[in-house]
Design a protein with these regions (language model features):
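Intrinsically disordered, low-complexity
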Residues: 1-27, 136-137
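Aromatic- and glycine-rich peptidoglycan recognition patches
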Residues: 2-9, 71-72, 89, 93-137
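Catalytic cysteine-centered active-site loop
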Residues: 8, 27-79, 130
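Solvent-exposed polar/charged
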Residues: 23, 50-51, 99
Length: 137
C-alpha cells in the first residue's frame, strides 16, 4: 500500500524504486552504516542505486555529486535524480544527499529521524539546498 508514502503513484512510476524505499522507511541513522539496522545518507542512496538501478556509485555524498552526476536544474528533477545539501557550518562541502521521488518529495536518511520522506520545499531543505544531479556514471 503506497499510502504510507503519501505519494500518489501512476503506471509510469518506477514501482521497484518505491517498493525498495518503503522497505527502508524508519531504518535508524548510523554514520557509516549501509544496512537497514543503521544507515547514513550516502549508504542509503548507494543501496537503492545498487538494488533498483544496478549502478555502483560513490560512498560519500560529495563524491557522488562530483564523480557520478551531472548537475541539472531543480525544475528538471525526475524520479531517481539526487538532491544535494550543505548542512554543516563546519565545512563548505556537500554533506547530505537524497533520492528525488515526485511532487517535491525525496527519500533520505536523516541524522535525527532515520530513513524518511521529506519535502524539498520545507524551509530547512530550501536553506541548505546545494544542487540537483542526475546519475550518469
Amino acid at each position: 500500500d503506497w499510502k504510507t508514502l503519501n505519494i500518489r503513484l501512476t503506471s509510469r512510476d518506477n514501482k521497484q524504486l518505491y517498493r525498495e524505499i518503503k522497505g527502508w522507511l524508519g531504518a535508524p541513522y548510523l554514520y557509516g552504516g549501509n544496512t537497514k539496522k543503521g544507515v547514513d545518507c550516502s549508504g542509503f542512496v548507494l543501496q537503492i542505486y545498487k538494488t533498483v538501478y544496478h549502478k555502483r556509485i560513490e560512498r560519500n555524498s560529495a563524491k557522488i555529486f562530483e564523480k557520478n552526476c551531472k548537475m541539472i536544474d531543480v525544475d528538471d528533477l525526475r524520479e531517481g535524480d539526487l538532491v544535494f545539501y550543505k548542512t554543516s557550518k563546519k565545512t563548505s562541502r556537500i554533506t547530505h544527499v537524497g533520492i528525488y521521488l515526485k511532487d517535491n518529495k525525496f527519500a533520505h536518511a536523516s541524522s535525527s529521524k532515520g530513513v524518511r520522506i521529506s519535502d524539498i520545499t520545507e524551509d530547512y531543505f530550501i536553506r541548505h539546498f546545494y544542487a540537483a544531479g542526475r546519475v550518469v556514471k
